[in-house]
Amino acid sequence: MSNRAEKKRFQQDLAADVNHLCQRAFESLVIVHNGRQGAGAGMIWHQDGTIVTNYHVVRKSSLRISTLDGSEYTAEIIDRQKKHDLALLKIETGEELVPAPLADSRQLRVGQFALAIGHPWGQVNSVTAGIITSLGSIPLRWHRGAVDVIRTDAGLAPGNSGGPLLDARGQVIGINTMIMGGDLGVAIPIHVVNDFAARKIDQDHAR
């Protein structure tokens, strides 16, 4: 087999692998419509209709959610936190939803494969790939103190905000939140998101 044929075969296999990895996550990916500001991404966190997205995506109180099958729902903001740029939404669908599969972001290492999914520039269910370039705490423009983040070279654009960052198994390792330096994506680690979301869900289910 020639080098050109080998390269083509590798690209085809890689594309098939990436598509397979993303399918489960796409089931949990939503579009967050926030009026005139446009749209961001979000992720089904719990089967009861709880959704995680970015704080900056939901500054408007009038929100609509579109799911993978094209259904639309009115969303209620049930909690938000500016420090980590996180927000929890709730939709009522009358049926159980498919929550995203989660990884343990505390086990991540620099150099690992990463996939960002979302709706950049209105392109629904788009995927970009890269690696984790650094891990650690950095100051963010909306918070004076340092915040734990994942930085990757997987391309982000408006419409990726609030969408998941996946590992090589298709599990969520973070929530994409901003672009830094023009070419690095920044995500909030999923263990930080879990601490934020779990408290609210546990409180609601305890009532």
Where are these regions (language model features)?
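Short conserved beta-strand and strand-loop elements enriched in small hydrophobics
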Residues: 32, 62-68, 114-118
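A conserved glycine-rich beta-strand in the N-terminal activation segment of trypsin-fold
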Residues: 13-20, 28-48, 71-74, 127, ...
